[in-house]
């Protein structure tokens, strides 16, 4: 009885301490550290549309009227980005900010600032945006995408469907996934594959490891029955592209000046 009396209270305190430590998962800790560096990107671009493209117009009448010109129309889109430098540099996807008239960046604290596209690279689907210096900007810590392995934890942060500060968890499902096998023959990329949920609006947001380091930039998803596969651009490549965009506004890619033909 004396033995239990002496150890009992100490054991209870130890258990309470353990439960306190375990009250939040590593995902919560990582998300709280990285979320201030994740931004929402809203864009506007002007497109030309058929003046009589309305579904209310009878198809026969539309054919009789013919081509009577086009009308300008405002198109709006949304994506994600990650602050990679506290001076206001935001890394995102090229398809998020290409040919835009206006870029608005919403920070985690709700403040919205205008952004300027420094440059885009269609081959790697990466872009660099500069926002004006704003007090308290927090840059994310970049990891080493050569150091990750299949089975490592993968955490996706972003604003899918405009839902800010969304966090999803998965693993690295595969490495060096050729983007050409996914139907994008105009790009040259080996992607990180993950089962962390990535949806429209996640594009340009970071893929994070369990240490809170950015290992990739989320770029596309393959959905459908039995699918739901997400893909991210390795951060080592993204960093190189960002440096070139910052220095030159563009990325120069080497190519072979030759054409393959079939010989009979």
Task: Say what each PLM segment does.
Residues 1-9:
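Bacterial N-terminal signal peptides
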């Amino acid at each position: 009885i004396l033995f239990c009396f002496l150890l009992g209270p100490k054991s209870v305190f130890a258990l309470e301490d353990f439960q306190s430590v375990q009250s939040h998962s590593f995902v919560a800790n990582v998300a709280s550290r990285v979320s201030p560096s994740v931004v929402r990107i809203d864009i506007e671009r002007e497109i030309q549309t058929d003046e009589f493209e309305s579904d209310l117009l009878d198809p026969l009448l539309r054919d009789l009227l013919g081509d009577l010109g086009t009308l300008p129309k405002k198109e709006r889109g949304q994506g994600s980005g990650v602050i990679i430098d506290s001076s206001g540099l935001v890394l995102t996807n090229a398809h998020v900010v290409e040919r835009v008239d206006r870029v608005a960046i919403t920070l985690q604290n709700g403040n919205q600032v205008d952004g300027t596209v420094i440059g885009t690279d269609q081959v790697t689907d990466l872009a660099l945006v500069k926002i004006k210096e704003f007090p308290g900007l927090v840059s994310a810590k970049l990891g080493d995408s050569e150091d990750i392995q299949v089975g490592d934890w993968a955490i996706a942060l972003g604003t899918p469907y405009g839902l800010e500060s969304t966090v999803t968890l998965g693993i690295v499902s595969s490495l060096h996934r050729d983007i050409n096998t996914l139907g994008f023959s105009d790009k040259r990329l080996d992607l990180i594959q993950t089962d962390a949920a990535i949806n429209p609006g996640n594009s340009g947001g970071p893929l994070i490891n369990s240490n809170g380091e950015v290992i990739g930039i989320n770029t596309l998803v393959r959905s459908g029955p039995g699918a739901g596969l997400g893909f991210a651009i390795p951060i080592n490549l993204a960093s190189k592209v960002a440096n070139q965009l910052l220095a030159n506004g563009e990325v120069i890619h080497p190519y072979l000046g030759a054409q393959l033909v079939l010989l009979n």
